[in-house]
């Protein structure tokens, strides 16, 4: 049986949240997540739900107390079920997604079997310490499990003027941050593009949710 393209039209407006799910070790990816959340919250009828994942121990078990000492709560599978859209973020690890986020994504096979995420829009974002540190390969890698889930990829179009002029982060595949370019945090271009991605994702999520 074919599934409908819309995310979940039965959701009440009050529960139409876009999940911003990320892993951040030094805070750069978290800052990007917060900027995307600001863009989501700027769209009437949408709200951002910020969630993170715990680090992994050498034995590849997630190792952390049930509640993080600061910042966003740890994600649960129900966060993915309940959202109408997803922004997924990770710092680059040798051109790939960081292990803690990959570990969490590997636990979503039950959602995949149920088709729980099929038809929901999703965006990706990343941060690196250098300009050519693997941003685009990391963004593309993060898209793969989302496509297996049947999610609809939402990127950044070149109608966003900063995308053509940025000297730091920002790609058509998703928002990004180059840490060494702006040591004080996100550059103005990175900030604008992250917020633009949040607005675009939220707008499309609401349209698909009906």
Residues covered by each model-derived region:
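Compositionally biased, intrinsically disordered low-complexity regions enriched in proline and serine
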Residues: 2, 23-24, 159, 174
């Amino acid at each position: 049986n074919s599934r409908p393209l819309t995310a979940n039209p039965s959701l009440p407006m009050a529960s139409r949240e876009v999940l911003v799910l990320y892993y951040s070790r030094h805070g750069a990816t978290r800052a990007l997540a917060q900027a995307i959340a600001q863009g989501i919250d700027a769209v009437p009828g949408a709200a951002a739900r910020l969630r993170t994942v715990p680090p992994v121990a050498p034995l590849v078990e997630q190792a952390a107390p049930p509640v993080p000492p600061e910042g966003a709560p740890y994600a649960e599978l129900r966060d993915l079920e309940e959202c109408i859209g997803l922004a997924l973020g990770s710092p680059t690890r040798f051109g790939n997604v960081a292990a803690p986020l990959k570990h969490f994504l590997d636990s979503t096979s039950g959602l995949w079997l149920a088709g729980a995420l099929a038809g929901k829009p999703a965006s990706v974002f990343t941060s690196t310490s250098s300009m050519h540190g693997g941003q685009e390969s990391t963004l593309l890698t993060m898209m793969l499990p989302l496509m297996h889930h049947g999610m609809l990829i939402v990127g950044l179009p070149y109608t966003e003027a900063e995308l053509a002029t940025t000297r730091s982060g920002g790609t058509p595949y998703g928002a990004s941050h180059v840490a060494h370019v702006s040591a004080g945090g996100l550059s103005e271009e990175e900030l604008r593009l992250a917020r633009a991605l949040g607005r675009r994702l939220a707008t499309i999520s609401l349209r698909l949710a009906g």
